[in-house]
Structures are given as structure tokens and as C-alpha cells.
């Protein structure tokens, strides 16, 4: 009513945060109603592992030392679990509706290894803390160059 009364229009997009494994596994059911899906990788990692991010600092170093995990999953995205959930969501949603924009928000948006995975998955954007933006931009450019080089072979 207000926009009609004022003669103004507000452009907006409808999207969803994908922060739980259940959301990723149900992406196809949301796809027809959204224009974007943004993966909240911090919470998605926490929910996938069942770790509290607040407590993980106490035991992640031991897991790394014992080689139970390759990387701190709150720094570098775990592609085999969290990444697989993301891949499933993108594939399932894309089958239902073309043109959805996919991205991530979270600290993984500033990690070069994670950014390469996001590029390979075909995500449209990453969002991260301001101090990580320079690293994210360089990593995204490198991922793009590496993908182009691989295509030319």
C-alpha cells in the first residue's frame, strides 16, 4: 500500500540461507520459490559435524595432529561432507529451476582452497569478513585462471 501511495517501487529478490544439512537435501523443494541460495558454511559445517564452533578449538588441533582430519573444517571447507551437501543442493535445485544464483557467506569465503571448490561447483559469489576480501579476490582470480588453463589442455 505504501509503495503504491508513494509511487515508489522497491526491487528485491527472494532467497534462502542454506545452513543445515536438511536444507541442502531439500533444495529441490525450495527451488521454484527462490532467486538465490546462500550457503552459510560456518553453520552448515557445525551442523554437519555436530561440533560447536565455540568448543572446536579445544579438540580440532588434536584431530589434526592425529590426522583424523586434513584441515580445520572451520577454516577450509570439508569437500567430502559439507561440499557434497552443497553439490547435492545445487544439482537438485538446478534441475527444478534454472537461473538461481548460488553463493556462500562465512569464513570459508576467504579461504583459497575453499574458493577453488566454490568456483569448480559453479557458485556465483562468496561473501566473507572485510579483512579477508583481498585474499578472496586473488583466490577467485587464481581459480578462474586454473579452470581456463585446464579447459585449454
Regions found by a protein language model. Name each.
Residues 1-153:
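Conserved alpha/beta-domain cores
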Amino acid at each position: 500500500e505504501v509503495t503504491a501511495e508513494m509511487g515508489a517501487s522497491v526491487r528485491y529478490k527472494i532467497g534462502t540461507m542454506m545452513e543445515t544439512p536438511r536444507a541442502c537435501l531439500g533444495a529441490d523443494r525450495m527451488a521454484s520459490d527462490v532467486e538465490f541460495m546462500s550457503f552459510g558454511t560456518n553453520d552448515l559445517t557445525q551442523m554437519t559435524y555436530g561440533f560447536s564452533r565455540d568448543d572446536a578449538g579445544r579438540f580440532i588441533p588434536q584431530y589434526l595432529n592425529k590426522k583424523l582430519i586434513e584441515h580445520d573444517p572451520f577454516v577450509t571447507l570439508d569437500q567430502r561432507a559439507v561440499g557434497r551437501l552443497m553439490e547435492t543442493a545445487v544439482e537438485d535445485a538446478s534441475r527444478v529451476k534454472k537461473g538461481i544464483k548460488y553463493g556462500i557467506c562465512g569464513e570459508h569465503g576467504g579461504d583459497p582452497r575453499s574458493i577453488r571448490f566454490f568456483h569448480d561447483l559453479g557458485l556465483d559469489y562468496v561473501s566473507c569478513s572485510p579483512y579477508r576480501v583481498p585474499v578472496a579476490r586473488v583466490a577467485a582470480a587464481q581459480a578462474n585462471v586454473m579452470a581456463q588453463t585446464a579447459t585449454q589442455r
